[in-house]
Curated annotation (Swiss-Prot):
It is found in: Cytoplasm. Belongs to the SmpB family. InterPro entries: SmpB (IPR023620), SsrA-bd_prot (IPR000037), SsrA-bd_prot_CS (IPR020081). One of its GO terms (biological process) is trans-translation. GO terms for molecular function: RNA binding. Keywords: Cytoplasm, RNA-binding. This is SsrA-binding protein.
Amino acid sequence: MNKKKNAPVRKIIADNRKARFNFEILNNLEAGLVLQGAEVKSLRSNHANIAESYASFENGELWLVNSYIPEYTQANRFNHEPRRLRKLLLSKREMARFFNATSREGMTLVPLKLYFNERGRVKLEIALARGKKLHDKRETEKKRDWGREKARLLKRYG
């Protein structure tokens, strides 16, 4: 008999749910990260926080700023700094496109997910985003509440 192929496994380490509420997501992209060994071991134990982080350009390179990967407890003197800058790996074309987009006013690069891909490599899903105004956030909340209410009504009477 034919064996079914399993869907690719993406083990999510950290998810930035706040970004989807605070920003209007325009374009997503997967980027690699330059990490040290102790950082990867710490990530394998699902410890990371990217909620307050962002990506910025310095000297033609893209860096992840303010991400938190705690020190690995079994590592000794070779441990890493938890809030250090981490280089993002993108092709030159993608980097140029993002650089041009972020140079426009109101655009920023926000990390959405940190995960292990099918090959066991740590990847970061970053998005080109524009900040939402307060009234936009309220409108999004109203739409979400109405969707939930609609689902309840359909379940009860439908």
